[in-house]
């Protein structure tokens, strides 16, 4: 037994078999033992952290393999190896290697011991919510062995599936409505595409269909999101509707339900009929307020401004996209807020328990430019390759970016590149500018 504990050679080959996250190779520094005499400590050397996609398609499984070489204290155990899970710069949980299913092999050569670890850092054992984490691996107690810490990215995704807008087709005798319904937390309005038989009187048909509420399979708030609207008509890009006089029930009782009712009306009319203003009357007469005190003395504007399309998991395990309004005064602020939302699942410093991050922090926005209504966004990684066999998640990421970026003023089309190379994935070929999908979140 040596009297002193050495700074050791730590070769961490961290192989993440998280097939939906084949991240780029990262690096960390660690001290190296040099020469035949283990008492001779060399200067800090650079060692590679290898992150491999492997063959597993589970978004909740991460196999971490690493080797610790050095002179160990006889009391050393798996409890000394720690994992910090960091989100948004804060450590949300610290766990020990012994908290996970692991395998450990030991060997010794010339007085230097080696411990080979294989640890399953699975989401269930970690008891963490879906999202992007930075993983820190280290030994805190230097009396056991001195170990240089290492960092890498980890992305836990929900088990639910995403239905791509590309699955929606225009069919003879049918039409598609985009309808807005609150999620079960009343934090987001979720656009849902419903395919219905074609009819001539579209305006009344649209409002009645919205009032039917979402299908229970979508896992959203059930029932009608809006009060009964006895009269509605359209002239050009202006819609006028009349609410009944008197108590509107739940729509007059609380601010959340009332605000979501107003938003559901304006967004549904805008997305389906191109309505820019909505004039609200009471009993076909002008009034000052309605819906729990909302001002109706002037028409409501339907222009949305910049929005980040968040990824939500509903009560029934559906993964859906939902817009969150951003408070930004220029393109740079809006785009920065969008990518913060993509990486944290948080918009405007508000985090819904249904929302989750879908981009790891290692994916950087390298550059963007806007020209002739086209925005070109250059990323540090091909986002369609982050999720392995989970192509539904790749579609979700692409659709989130397309829907978000086209909410910017004077932006109609998008080009996505990875290190300057246009991204190509299934039906998406960004060698040419692409519009956002015509529909979103098919109702199934």
Which residues fall in each region the model found?
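Bimodal "functional hotspot" detector
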Residues: 2-444
